[in-house]
UniProtKB/Swiss-Prot annotation:
Top-level division of the source organism's lineage: Viruses
GO cellular component, one term: viral capsid
GO biological process: symbiont genome ejection through host cell envelope, contractile tail mechanism
Predominant place of localization: virion
Upper lineage: Viruses, Duplodnaviria, Heunggongvirae, Uroviricota, Caudoviricetes
Compartments, record wording: Virion
Function: Forms the portal vertex of the capsid. This portal plays critical roles in head assembly, genome packaging, neck/tail attachment, and genome ejection. The portal protein multimerizes as a single ring-shaped homododecamer arranged around a central channel. Binds to the terminase subunits to form the packaging machine.
Oligomer status and interactors: Homododecamer.
Protein family per UniProt: Belongs to the phage portal family. PBSX subfamily.
The entry's keywords: Capsid protein, Viral capsid assembly, Viral contractile tail ejection system, Viral genome ejection through host cell envelope, Viral genome packaging, Viral penetration into host cytoplasm, Viral release from host cell, Virion, Virus entry into host cell
Name of this chain's protein: Probable portal protein
Length: 344
């Protein structure tokens, strides 16, 4: 009987003695904080604590937002400066206090003026009480100075004048006209901070370094990784030297991801948000030292300034003159606006 032919035994699989090359990935950059102050608009009413009413929006939030964007703060300061230039100082009210009063009104939609008395009970001067910390009292003609909740001080009844920008929802506090443009101011600020953080981080890589060259060992990869990570931060624009003997032409590839300009749309965001802010403040771009887009010249700036003063500043002067009715005498006076400095 013939012997059965056994199957030829298969050789055992060889055990891998060395691990193959591994893919390695690491990231650049750090989380970027994004400012969002929508909480200043979350108040629904003027809440009373028994002594004073809280404002319908956060005055602290409005104060922080003042410098959120160039096209938000600059129009306010332009209006303040023009008004201050036409104000005629009075023994009771200095130029400085008037400027503070106007700035408070433009930023917060509220401005407070306090009577200061002599020892004989006569009014000797008027001082601006910062609107950020001044509150309307529950009792009539009573106002409170509240720099902190634990240190409130009541003003003498009838000693504080309150100028407010009327609101359609309540009559206790005013609201600034620019509230609808605050989201544009915050967007403008967020875009600027994102771009600034981008450059400070030095995370400008925007590419994938794809290494397939077999001659690279682990030490080479680690050294390359460390040098690239060290290139972040200040002085990050550095040259990187890499020596790869017997390397292939395509052993190391740089694959760009995309330009950051197309990712965050920085310039379009800045332009759109700036236009919103200028529309909200209703101030010509030329009066802030800028030039409108797609316009060859600034036009007749003198005519622009006169129209702006007639439509915006004269109504503000009339509002501020309400102080005279409260005092019973003419303390607030203005001279005519003129571009001719020889007439000052």
């Amino acid at each position: 009987m013939s012997k059965k032919k056994g199957k030829t035994p298969q050789p055992a699989a060889k055990t891998m003695t060395a691990s193959g090359p591994k893919m390695e990935a690491f990231t650049f950059g750090e989380p970027v904080p994004v400012l969002d102050r929508r909480d200043i608009l979350d108040y629904v009413e003027c809440i009373s604590n028994g002594r004073w009413y809280e404002p319908p929006v956060s005055f602290t939030g409005l104060a922080k937002s003042l410098r959120a964007a160039v096209h938000h703060s600059s129009p306010i300061y332009v209006k303040r400066n023009i008004l201050a230039s036409t104000f005629i100082p009075h023994p009771w009210l200095s130029q400085q206090d008037f400027s503070r009063f106007v700035l408070d009104f433009l930023v917060f939609g509220n401005a407070f003026l306090e009577k200061r008395y002599s020892t004989t009970g006569k009014v000797i001067r008027l001082e601006t009480s910062p609107a950020k910390y001044t509150r309307r009292g529950v009792e009539e003609d009573v106002y409170w100075w509240v720099p902190s909740f634990n240190e409130p001080t009541a003003f003498a009844p009838g000693s504080v004048f309150h100028l407010l920008e009327p609101d359609i929802n309540q009559e206790l506090y005013g609201l600034p006209e620019y509230l609808s443009a605050l989201n544009s101011a915050w967007l403008n600020e967020s875009a600027t901070l994102f771009r600034r953080k981008y450059y400070e981080n030095g995370a400008h890589a925007g590419y994938i370094m794809y290494v397939t060259d077999a001659v690279q060992d682990r030490n080479d990869i680690e050294m390359l990784r460390e040098n690239m990570v060290k290139s972040k931060g200040r002085n990050n624009f550095k040259n990187l030297f890499l020596y790869a003997p017997q390397g292939k032409a395509d052993g190391i590839k740089i694959i760009p991801l995309s330009e950051v300009a197309t990712k965050d749309d920085f310039f379009n965001i800045k332009k759109a948000s700036a236009a919103d802010l200028l529309d909200a403040h209703r101030i010509p771009f030329q009066l802030m030292g800028g030039k409108p887009e797609n316009v060859g010249s600034l036009g007749d700036i003198e005519k622009v300034a006169k129209v702006f003063v007639r439509n915006e500043l004269i109504p503000l002067q009339d509002r501020i003159r309400e102080i005279n009715g409260w005092l019973g005498q003419e303390v607030i006076r203005f001279k005519n606006y003129s571009l001719d400095t020889d007439n000052d």
